[in-house]
């Protein structure tokens, strides 16, 4: 599944087109390389879908792991020079478009505003597996659980 968005052609320095696509399993090592190159603590989920935003190379990524009757979104990361250009928002939208059901994520409380703009709201309930993870992860850092219907 490939989604392509083009930048505005008004400037000769306009950003090249960005493709949003499901990363084939055979290319999954590229996702780990992308995270490492940017010294991110993110890791590619071993199961589920890996989605990327690409120009000539990967510029953003996220993972969607099936859980209960929905998905758990992890690993959202955009290369620092491209932040502020709605790459993350467009990547989320492209990845969730073919899905149905709930999508959950955990984030630092400071990121709630960003995710609210992407259509997420505070999760009132979590699947048991995610509730247990949230409790475990919250021991070492502040986290909130958010939810969006795909």
Question: Where does each model-flagged region fall?
Answer:
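Conserved acetyl-CoA-binding loop-helix of GNAT-fold acetyltransferases
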Residues: 78, 84-97
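Conserved beta-strand in the GNAT
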Residues: 52, 57-66, 70-77
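Conserved GNAT acetyl-CoA-binding A-motif
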Residues: 97-110
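Conserved active-site alpha-helix within GNAT-family acetyltransferase domains
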Residues: 109-136
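Acidic/histidine-enriched, beta-strand-rich ligand/metal-binding domains
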Residues: 74-75, 81-83, 117
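Accessory recognition modules or surfaces
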Residues: 88-89, 133-144
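Short amphipathic alpha-helix that is part of the acyltransferase structural core
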Residues: 2-44, 52, 126, 141-150
């Amino acid at each position: 599944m490939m989604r392509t968005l083009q930048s505005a052609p008004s400037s000769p320095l306009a950003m090249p087109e960005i493709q949003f696509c499901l990363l084939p399993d055979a290319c999954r090592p590229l996702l780990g390389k992308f995270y490492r190159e940017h010294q991110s603590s993110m890791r590619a989920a071993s199961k589920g879908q890996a989605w990327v935003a690409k120009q000539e190379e990967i510029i953003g990524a996220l993972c969607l792991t099936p859980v209960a009757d929905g998905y758990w979104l992890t690993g959202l990361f955009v290369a620092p020079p491209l932040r502020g250009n709605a790459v993350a928002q467009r990547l989320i939208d492209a990845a969730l478009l073919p899905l149905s059901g709930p999508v959950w994520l955990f984030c630092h409380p400071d990121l709630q505003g960003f995710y609210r703009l992407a259509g997420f709201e505070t999760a009132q309930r979590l699947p048991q597996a995610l509730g247990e993870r949230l409790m475990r992860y919250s021991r070492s850092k502040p986290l909130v659980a958010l939810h969006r219907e795909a």
